[in-house]
């Protein structure tokens, strides 16, 4: 029997660590939190200094029993949950359930799950850091007080199943504020003039810049006519050439927020998926002969700091692969996170390259690991050097300008370039070699009318970035917050951008009217600052809670008395119930919209909303192929005659048969291209854009 018991959150993490520690250690998983506030009641005594009432989470009884059995037999119990506030709280709850000594040095933390890091952490166990626990408790109790007081009011006055929360309500506000900006936006006319110029055999483009040596706004067609009237023929002169060398530094290694943003843009991953895959990489991958190893450092962090050991290893790799000139000469600029002395997200070893790891990883694991690895290695590489040139092209009072750039030294761009929501500006644009006084010919002068555009709706990446910039929430809260406002049907995705629903706007208006603090950005930011102060030991958690609740409970009382009941009318479905003849209406359920009888509860008939794709079922040739959604919201195709016909396909049938085997053809999407393939054999048609 092992003398030492180690408790971690997950079986995957337990399996990895046990291999490192040897036979004297037994490592078991708590399966996350074992204690929490009860779901059936508030669980916070507002009359007794906000004392929380923690209970064993439903279904965790057998886990707790197993933990107690092993703890009783062990000489030493070590708590090795994750190295953040949440992990510290899990360790504290475990110590209470197992009745461990408060002053016992039994807490071990490591930022990466590698043999050296884990063994080193066990040489330096410490006491549970109660300031971190209290910061987590304060957040949990705050969220419980808000949710359990506002939600019943919304259920009573608006609709059952609604919720509001400190972070989710601000996230919803951001989406709605942006939508209102778009609705209120008044487009303004403007024009641009682009010219195509020729010098010898080279052609290049330039834009109108000045009229009579001053900026001249092209607001209307009259302005255009004024400029075109001033032009005299097609001959222009180069009146100024400005050459500069520009340095572009690599982006810092990932934080939680920047990882979620970049994975959304480059890999099309949702925030929740990014965190799930990152957790797998952190907790350990079976590398066969090398054993199970955590491939990345802890993935919930707001720090860009890198350890000296990791920097040295990256420098060695870069020197060997690219040469000394590609290594960074800059001093470290990484920021320390607000939550503890974490590092940025990086590979646990630069020497474990994505290509070497590919055979051990799933497709998603490989893509995310490659992104993390390349971003980190690039962050330790030399800047890129760009040669820029600006040409002023003049005729009389009219001046055009052409800007060009070429890459002189690629540096980090050899490996990795950060993407943006908008078009990146790092593309090469070569201009012919021209000197002041050279003559060029205009081959085309083209005015174009434009209108100003409203601000774009939020993508998931942009919403995460905005939440981080405003200091709303923490690395661990971004993904669940975005998930919640979608599950509650407060927002929906259209073309990968968030649009508020009618329900979302109704809930927002009520929260805005009766609980203004909850959606106030400054209030939410100040609360995060107070939580940080609790973690640093500068203020007690009870004082923070009391400062909030004393005014909040008055808002709750006012809302209960004054908020008017709002009736949300169901959308007509346009057909009658086949059971009782009453009109069918469209309802919103857990997995999206569905049809239900308006005569509920007397009639409980429901139907899925199906969308025909205009193709006959290839199996029965009687029903139509309709688009449906799985419980995980994935689109699939079935027969309208179901259950009589059980045809099903993940790919969209196109209504034609394969010329090779006569089975049905489908559209198969791979990234940004769509291919027509056979559902049965290897027949393929050319990819379509």
UniProtKB/Swiss-Prot annotation:
Pfam families hit by this protein: Topoisom_bac, Toprim, Zn_ribbon_Top1
Keywords: DNA-binding, Isomerase, Magnesium, Metal-binding, Repeat, Topoisomerase, Zinc, Zinc-finger
Residues involved in Mg(2+) binding: 9, 82
Molecular function per GO: DNA binding; DNA topoisomerase type I (single strand cut, ATP-independent) activity; zinc ion binding
Active site positions: 298
Domain Toprim residues, every copy: 3-113
GO cellular component terms attached to this protein's record: chromosome
Region (Disordered): 328-357
Region feature Interaction with DNA, mapped onto this chain: 163-168
GO BP term, pick one: DNA topological change
Catalytic activity: ATP-independent breakage of single-stranded DNA, followed by passage and rejoining
The keyword Repeat is assigned to this record: yes
Sites marked Interaction with DNA: 33, 139-140, 143, 148, 155, 300, 488
Domain Topo IA-type catalytic residues, every copy: 129-557
Family: Belongs to the type IA topoisomerase family.
Subunit structure: Monomer.
NCBIfam families noted in UniProt: topA_bact
HAMAP family in the cross-refs: Topoisom_1_prok
Name of this chain's protein: DNA topoisomerase 1
Organism: Staphylococcus aureus (strain bovine RF122 / ET3-1)
Taxonomic path: Bacteria, Bacillati, Bacillota, Bacilli, Bacillales
Gene: topA
């Amino acid at each position: 029997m092992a003398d030492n018991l180690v408790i971690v959150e997950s079986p995957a993490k337990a399996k990895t660590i046990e291999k490192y520690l040897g036979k004297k250690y037994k490592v078991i998983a708590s399966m996350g939190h074992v204690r929490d506030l009860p779901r059936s009641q508030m669980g916070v005594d507002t009359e007794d200094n906000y004392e929380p009432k923690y209970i064993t989470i439903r279904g965790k009884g057998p886990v707790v029993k197993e933990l107690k059995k092993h703890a009783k037999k062990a000489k030493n119990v070590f708590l090795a949950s994750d190295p953040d506030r949440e992990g510290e709280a899990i360790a504290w709850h475990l110590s209470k359930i197992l009745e461990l000594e408060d002053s016992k040095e039994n807490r071990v933390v490591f930022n990466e799950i590698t043999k050296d890091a884990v063994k080193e952490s066990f040489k330096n166990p410490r006491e549970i850091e109660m300031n971190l626990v209290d910061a987590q408790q304060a957040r949990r109790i705050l969220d419980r007080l808000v949710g359990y007081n506002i939600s019943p009011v919304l259920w009573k006055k608006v609709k059952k199943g609604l919720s509001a929360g400190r972070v989710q309500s601000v996230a919803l506000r951001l989406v709605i504020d942006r939508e209102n900006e778009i609705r209120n936006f008044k487009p303004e006319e403007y024009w641009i003039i682009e010219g195509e110029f020729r010098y010898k055999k080279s052609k290049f483009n330039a834009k109108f810049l000045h009229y009579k040596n001053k900026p001249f706004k092209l607001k209307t067609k009259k302005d255009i006519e004024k400029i075109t009237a001033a032009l005299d023929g097609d001959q222009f002169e180069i009146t100024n050439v400005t050459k500069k060398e520009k340095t572009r530094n690599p982006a810092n290694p990932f934080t939680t927020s920047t990882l979620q943003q970049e994975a959304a843009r480059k890999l099309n991953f949702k925030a929740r998926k990014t965190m799930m895959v990152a957790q797998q990489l952190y907790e350990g991958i079976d590398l066969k002969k090398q054993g199970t190893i955590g491939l990345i450092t802890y993935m919930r962090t707001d720090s860009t700091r890198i350890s000296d050991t990791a920097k040295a290893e990256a420098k060695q790799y870069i020197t060997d692969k690219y040469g000394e000139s590609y290594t960074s000469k800059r001093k470290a600029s990484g920021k320390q996170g607000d939550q503890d002395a974490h590092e940025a997200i990086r590979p646990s070893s630069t020497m474990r390259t994505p290509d070497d790891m590919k055979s051990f990883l799933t497709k998603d694991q490989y893509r995310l690991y490659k992104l993390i690895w390349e971003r980190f290695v690039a962050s330790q590489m030399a800047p890129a050097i760009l040669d820029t040139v600006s040409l002023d092209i003049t005729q009389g009072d009219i001046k055009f300008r052409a800007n060009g750039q070429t890459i002189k030294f690629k540096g980090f761009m050899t490996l990795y370039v950060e993407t943006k929501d908008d078009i990146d500006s790092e593309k090469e644009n070569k201009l012919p070699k021209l000197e002041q006084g050279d003559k060029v010919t205009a081959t085309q002068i083209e005015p174009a009318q434009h209108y100003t555009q409203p601000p774009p709706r939020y993508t998931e990446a942009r919403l995460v970035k905005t939440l981080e910039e405003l200091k709303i929430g923490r690395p661990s809260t971004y993904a669940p917050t975005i998930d919640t406002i979608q599950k509650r049907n407060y927002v929906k995705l259209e073309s990968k951008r968030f649009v508020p629903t009618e329900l979302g706007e109704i809930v927002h208006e009520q929260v805005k009217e009766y609980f203004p603090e909850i959606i106030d950005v400054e209030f939410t930011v100040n609360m995060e600052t107070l939580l940080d102060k609790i973690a640093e030991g500068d203020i007690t958690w009870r004082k923070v809670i009391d400062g909030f609740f004393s005014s909040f409970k008055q808002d709750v009382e006012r809302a209960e008395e004054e908020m008017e009941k709002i009736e949300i009318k169901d959308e007509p479905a346009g057909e009658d119930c086949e059971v009782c003849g009453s009109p069918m209406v469209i309802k919103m359920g857990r997995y999206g919209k569905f049809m239900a009888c308006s005569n509920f509860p007397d009639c409980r008939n429901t139907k899925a909303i199906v969308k025909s794709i205009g193709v006959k079922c290839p199996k029965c040739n009687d029903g139509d192929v309709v688009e449906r959604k799985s419980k995980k919201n994935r689109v699939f195709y079935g027969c309208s005659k179901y259950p009589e016909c059980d045809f099903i396909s993940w790919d969209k049938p196109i209504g034609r048969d394969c010329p090779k085997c006569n089975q049905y053809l489908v559209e198969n999407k791979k990234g940004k291209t769509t291919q027509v393939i056979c559902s049965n054999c290897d027949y393929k048609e050319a990819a379509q854009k």
